[in-house]
């Protein structure tokens, strides 16, 4: 589904994908009470989920969390700032990673469900982005946000592990987005090449362009097959999921950036204008190389998985 939506509009594909990202920690490690409460509401369309991991000083270095959660009786009190949060201000629920024991680094983080209506939750202005402009991205501010103790996801200290397990699965969603936007750009480029005439014949008759289109199609299908292979491992919970999730995301997003750029080239000057959709596809594709871990970080993840 993500692939097919992204084939037309990547911003729209973020609606289901971010809800998967935000709710998956509850599915993976939440108590039965949390699952019944929040996943039921999500399934009924009563509120969406966002995922709050990134911070101003914790991008690729996700372990460098500054948001704190402190016990106060039976409650937790959260303070901090989360950055680059998709659907911030729109979603009703937020999976928040916060430090509960600063001495333990990654083993001192925990995951919580924070509700939009909780006192002390506020949001920044929408970011002015290169692409995916139809999807809001904002900061989330937590100012003495008090939540009941039963909103912790999993056990105290398991937050970082839960966050990383979540990304193993959801990076495949990003790969699917990348395949979709690449396929959409290829579709448009093919149609244009058959209709656009220069030198008295369709530009698709030019062998140089044929080779470009062939490479685009080959790369898209290779990315699709790797993404589907990774998706199968996600469903089965295979041991090599970490490698396949990272490799699918990395390869498919690199393909998406190349194919959408090539699609602009096929359309020439027209591709550079907003009268045609490929310039938007090219701008949208860029984020797939960045979010849920840059492709440089994906290569670190893959190498560690191989050398383990």
For the regions a protein language model found, what residue spans apply to each?
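Alpha-helical interface subdomain recognition
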Residues: 1-13, 29-34, 45, 61, ...
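Conserved hydrophobic/aromatic beta-strand scaffold that supports enzyme active sites
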Residues: 50, 66-68, 75, 93-97, ...
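Short Gly/Pro-enriched turn/cap motifs at secondary-structure boundaries
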Residues: 57-60, 84-87, 101-103, 129-136
